[in-house]
Amino acid sequence: MTALDIIIMAAGKGTRMKSRIPKVLQRLAGRPLLHHVLGQAASLQARRVVVVTGHGATEVEAACAGSAGVGGTFDLKFVRQEPQLGTGHAVQQATPALAGDGTVVVLSGDVPLTQAATLRALVEAGAGERLALLTVRLPDPTGYGRIVRGEGGTVQRIVEHKDANDAERAIDEVYSGIMAVPAQRLAGWLARLTNDNAQGEYYLTDIVSMAVADGVPVAAHCIGDALQVAGVNSPAQLADLERAHQRAQAAALMEQGVRLADPARFDLRDDARSGARGEILCAQDVEIDVGCIFTGRVELGEGARIGAYCHISNATIAAGAVVHPFTHIDGEKTGAHVGEGALIGPFARLRPGAQLGREVHIGNFVEVKNSTLADGAKANHLAYLGDASVGERVNYGAGSITANYDGANKHRTVIEADVHIGSNCVLVAPVTIGAGGTVGGGSTITKDTPPGGLSVARGRQVSIANWKRPAKQAKG
């Protein structure tokens, strides 16, 4: 297989984005646009990738250094384009960093949805020292370089929109910005570029006419899916590509048998915090209601049901579990697990380290963080469990909390099996509630309690008969 080097154009400012963030670092599906393109390079098993930076170069280069999640073993290098004098000028900056043999593929850092199969077909079209262009036909080609063909349909040149005459502007086949070039020819063609055009820039597309003049065959690999070569220049375009990408992911899930209530209201994203790729693994008969967002790696077991507007990140939901609407499950880096047949929510929050056993119930406005709940444990209303180990069949009352933080350090609470915690209790860690014990409602527990006993720690009730409320003083 011919050695493959890749140049990624990532120097643009993206003025229309109206953002301080460089355009190629705007996020699609939770991942910077540039990371999507680096993933394309990885899919081609590139030997070397050269990223051409300019606006926000320091940020862009740092973001690339944190792109390990894209896969691939390529050698990553950076070059600066300062000033920015066109696409040809950008590639001129990159060529000294290339090996000089094989094939060079030029990609755009703001074109995130090009499929690996499309790029492989482009490289194949460029086999045998040909110049290969990725093209597409558009109903409105305004702004794009037109593919000008000669007799027999052979590609003769690319004319940029601003330099095209009326006849050329009527052409609907356009250049995508992606090409595969024989490396040994590239440097010579770049040396012949001029900026004698309407924009006063060095156009990379001018090498097409040079190839024709030099007798090098030019192949155009034309695709029918314009989304694969769509770039991002504005928030509206970014939103359009986001929805297109999410629709494609939803369609793939439905092909596997997942029931999506509305595929237009489904999101699967990378987790920017943990770096986990957006991935959802579903067993049979999984149901997902509208408006759900999944980030990082999520597993849904057989028959799991996810209610409307849930956000689930880096978590495993086991078979038969039901997550009711508006629940937030966030495993971040340590993960979260919901056991078989568990009932979660609505409006529940599971934070990193939440590990729930079979048939656990976590109800509305209950928060669980870094805690394990054994099979059959229940916390149904308005409660907090942090840094706790909860035994089987525990019933944890409404309004109860574990006070796990002393202002400097976290401490654990152990609630053994078959304990009943009354409403509005405070368990001040470190503390252990013995198996089978009961804690009376309203208690503040600061010491370990014995198994099987009743523990009450609250002020004694006083009732005053015939008590009269104070009368309001007259105004005046």
UniProtKB/Swiss-Prot annotation:
Where do the record's region annotations for Linker lie? 236-256
Q: Where is the active site?
A: H381
Q: Which residues bind UDP-N-acetyl-alpha-D-glucosamine?
A: K23, Q81, G86, T87, S108, G109, D110, G145, E160, N233, R351, K369, Y384, N395
- Per its UniProt record, what InterPro entries does this chain match? Bifunctional_GlmU, GlmU-like, GlmU_C_LbH, Hexapep, MobA-like_NTP_Trfase, Nucleotide-diphossugar_trans, Trimer_LpxA-like_sf
**Which biological process, per GO, is one annotated for this protein?**
cell wall organization
* Cofactor names: Mg(2+)
Superkingdom, natural source: Bacteria
Q: Where is this region: Pyrophosphorylase?
A: 1-235
Query: What is any Pfam family matched here?
Result: Hexapep
Q: In which pathway does it act?
A: Nucleotide-sugar biosynthesis; UDP-N-acetyl-alpha-D-glucosamine biosynthesis; N-acetyl-alpha-D-glucosamine 1-phosphate from alpha-D-glucosamine 6-phosphate (route II): step 2/2; Nucleotide-sugar biosynthesis; UDP-N-acetyl-alpha-D-glucosamine biosynthesis; UDP-N-acetyl-alpha-D-glucosamine from N-acetyl-alpha-D-glucosamine 1-phosphate: step 1/1; Bacterial outer membrane biogenesis; LPS lipid A biosynthesis
Region ranges (N-acetyltransferase): 257-476
Q: Which SUPFAM superfamilies match?
A: Nucleotide-diphospho-sugar transferases (SSF53448), Trimeric LpxA-like enzymes (SSF51161)
Which GO molecular-function terms appear in the entry? glucosamine-1-phosphate N-acetyltransferase activity; magnesium ion binding; UDP-N-acetylglucosamine diphosphorylase activity
Top enzyme class, one word, equals transferase
Q: How is the cofactor bound?
A: Binds 1 Mg(2+) ion per subunit.
Enzyme Commission number(s): 2.7.7.23, 2.3.1.157
Similarity comment: In the N-terminal section; belongs to the N-acetylglucosamine-1-phosphate uridyltransferase family. In the C-terminal section; belongs to the transferase hexapeptide repeat family.
Q: Which NCBIfam families match?
A: glmU (TIGR01173)
Task: Please give the function described in this protein's UniProt entry.
Answer: Catalyzes the last two sequential reactions in the de novo biosynthetic pathway for UDP-N-acetylglucosamine (UDP-GlcNAc). The C-terminal domain catalyzes the transfer of acetyl group from acetyl coenzyme A to glucosamine-1-phosphate (GlcN-1-P) to produce N-acetylglucosamine-1-phosphate (GlcNAc-1-P), which is converted into UDP-GlcNAc by the transfer of uridine 5-monophosphate (from uridine 5-triphosphate), a reaction catalyzed by the N-terminal domain.
Describe the subunit structure: Homotrimer.
Q: What is this protein called?
A: Bifunctional protein GlmU
Its taxonomic placement starts with: Bacteria, Pseudomonadati, Pseudomonadota, Betaproteobacteria, Burkholderiales
